Amino acid sequence: MQTIEIGNKAELQACKFLHTQALEILAHNFKALPYGEIDIIALDKDTLVFIEVKYRSKTKFAQAEEMLTYSKQQKLVNSASIYLQHNPQYQDYQCRFDLIAINESNINWIKNAFGVI
């Protein structure tokens, strides 16, 4: 299976999981050039959540949780800023950055995976 197909499958799995947790999915693969994309954007009650999905089929060398680098965090923050510029109706919402880490068949939802100063 190609890397993109694997990523899409993991993101779909994450969306289904978040739906069971009562989150409303607003966007999937939001493109925020030149920074990249945000895997999932959702509402958790009155909080706007930007979610990165990481998948590892083999955890011998690293867990999915370990794959969210500082550089990726900065890209997510910049991408979130672009999303808010394009969607001013969410400007006054609290924002949060979460990680959905999928290791083999386990899903780990890390709320507030990193903070923004």
From Swiss-Prot:
GO molecular function, one term: nucleic acid binding
Signal peptide range in chain numbering: none
UniProt-listed NCBIfam families: PRK12497.1-3, PRK14682.1, YraN family protein
Protein family: Belongs to the UPF0102 family.
Protein name stated in the entry: UPF0102 protein FTW_1281
Species, as recorded: Francisella tularensis subsp. tularensis (strain WY96-3418)
